[in-house]
Structure formats: C-alpha cells, structure tokens
C-alpha cells in the first residue's frame, strides 16, 4: 500500500543525503523550530526557557512532517520544550524504573532470560516525555570498552537468550560499530534473539543503510526491530521504504507507542496509527 505525501523540495534533497549529515543539521534552537513552523515566538517564551532542563533536538525530516502554523500539531508537541517542565511534583522520581544501579556498565538485567544493552546515550530526537532524560549516561558511555564488559557479563550468564539494544538510541552507533558488537553477540552460543529498539528511522529514514541491512541479514540471531511511533503523521513514504528494506532481509518489525495526552490519547487516533503501521509492515 502506497502512502501519499506532499511533494517537498527539501525532502527531495534529503533522499540522497547521508544520515550523519542530516543528524548534524538537526535543529537545536526552539526559536528556529518556531520560525520554520511559522509560529509566534512571543507566545512560547516560557516554554523556550525549558530548553535548559533538557535540550531540544529535532532532525529536519521530522519537522517537515509537522503542520505549519499549528501549535497543537501532534509531532510538534512531542519535541517542543514545555513551560510545565519547571513544575516540581511532590513524589516525583528521576529514576522511576530503577535503572541507575546496573550489574555492569551499559546493561539492565531485570528479567531472567533477557538483557538490555545501552549502546549509545544520545538520540537523534529529544522527546519531551523521555523517561531516561536523567539517566547517568556519563557513567555508561557507548564505547567498545564498556560494550566488552557487557559482553563478558552476557557470556557468563547462560540463562540470557535475548539481548535488547537500546539507549539513548542504538542506531546512533555507526554501522561498523554495530557490526563489531553484533558479531561478538553472535559468538555467545546461548543467545538466540536480538531486539533493537529505535526511533531514529522515524526521524531520519536514511539511517537504514544497505550496510546495516546486510549486517542483520548475515546474522545468525533472530532479529526484531521495534520502532517508536506515536502518531500516524510520523509515517510517510520514506519510512515505508526504509521498513521494506528491513523486511526484505527477514527482520521482524514491531512498534512501541507512548500514550500521550493531547497527542494520541484518542481511540480514533490510535486506530489510524495501527492501520498505517500495518500498511507499512509493522505490527502495532
């Protein structure tokens, strides 16, 4: 099924752009984002200040999916800094999932047969609802030294059957880094599945390179990729094409959504999201 999108000259240029170039060109100034979307800066002064609590970062392909002049656009609301972020709520916990005490660098081992490995601390887009915005990534740096410690831990725990690559966003790692890591995971005999949780292809579809697809195609591990898509407006032709490349090499595609007030907390919106996900081969 083909998903129609508006013809956009900037989008045409970016079809052939390198994902790292697009990432480097991401918008980090709230005022620039407001200018692009033709929204009045004076109405967002207090929200702009919340940038100091958590930086704004939005790749331009994702901005192109937003409706200009609409302050209630569901994609804009996910990334724009908010005045409400200054509210100090009684009982609020900066580590709600108790993730800051780890058995080894970069890992979370909550469940008997699977383990989460934080590949990289950064993301291509900073979502305002991020529950790891306070995670001490400086103590869990995404480098080969820490990955090797995680690999040693996995090798010493034969009950682990599945490794989940997370972050941050694991696809912030370059293809050669992922190749290094995945090949070493393959060498651990008790591992059978690899799960990759990522939002990067949603905001920069060019991240799904031929080299990355080949790495997954060559792996002995059963591979699943879980996208993070919250609204049907995030899905377009370029994302569809990227997902098709993954399906063609046998990757199982799933989606994880966050229920967000005034963004997707409506049955009709969620139904439309599920239908679009099915259309591009992703199981909601």
How would you label these PLM feature ranges?
Residues 148-162, 171-284:
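Conserved AdoMet/S-adenosylmethionine-binding subsite of the radical SAM
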Residues 137-139, 167-168, 196:
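Surface-exposed cleft-lining segments at the edges of enzyme active sites
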Residues 117-118, 163-165, 170-171:
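Conserved catalytic-core segments centered on acid/base and nucleophilic motifs
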Residues 130-142:
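Iron-sulfur (Fe-S) cluster-binding segments and ferredoxin-like electron-carrier domains
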Residues 55-58, 101-131:
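N-terminal pre-triad scaffold of radical SAM enzymes
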Residues 1-109:
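Flexible, acidic/Gly-rich N-terminal and inter-domain linker regions that tether
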Residues 123, 135, 170, 201:
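Short, glycine/serine-rich, charged loops/turns that create anion-binding
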């Amino acid at each position: 099924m083909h998903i129609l999108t508006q013809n956009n000259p900037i989008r045409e240029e970016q079809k052939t752009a390198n994902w790292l170039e697009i990432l480097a060109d991401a918008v980090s100034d709230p005022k620039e984002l407001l200018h692009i979307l033709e929204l009045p800066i004076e109405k967002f002064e207090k929200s702009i200040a919340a940038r100091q609590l958590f930086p704004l970062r939005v790749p331009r392909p994702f901005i192109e999916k937003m409706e200009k002049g609409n302050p209630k656009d569901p994609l804009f609301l996910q990334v724009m800094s908010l005045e409400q972020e200054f509210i100090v709520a009684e009982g609020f916990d900066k580590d709600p999932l108790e993730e800051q005490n780890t058995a080894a660098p970069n890992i979370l081992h909550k469940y008997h047969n699977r383990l989460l490995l934080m590949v990289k601390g950064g993301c291509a887009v900073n979502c305002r609802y991020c529950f790891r915005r306070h995670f001490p990534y400086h103590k869990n740096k995404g480098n080969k030294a820490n990955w090797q410690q995680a690999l040693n831990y996995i090798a010493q725990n034969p009950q682990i059957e599945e490794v989940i690559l997370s972050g941050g966003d694991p696809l912030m790692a370059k293809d050669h880094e992922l190749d290094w890591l995945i090949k070493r995971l393959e060498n651990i005999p008790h591992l059978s599945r690899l799960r990759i949780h990522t939002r990067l292809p949603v905001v920069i579809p060019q991240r799904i390179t031929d080299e990355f697809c080949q790495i997954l195609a060559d792996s002995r591990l059963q591979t699943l990729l879980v996208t993070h898509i919250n609204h049907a407006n995030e899905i377009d032709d370029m994302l569809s094409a990227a997902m098709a490349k993954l399906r063609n090499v046998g990757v199982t595609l799933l989606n994880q959504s966050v229920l967000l007030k005034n963004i997707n907390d409506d049955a009709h919106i969620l139904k439309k999201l599920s239908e679009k996900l099915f259309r591009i081969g992703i199981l909601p």
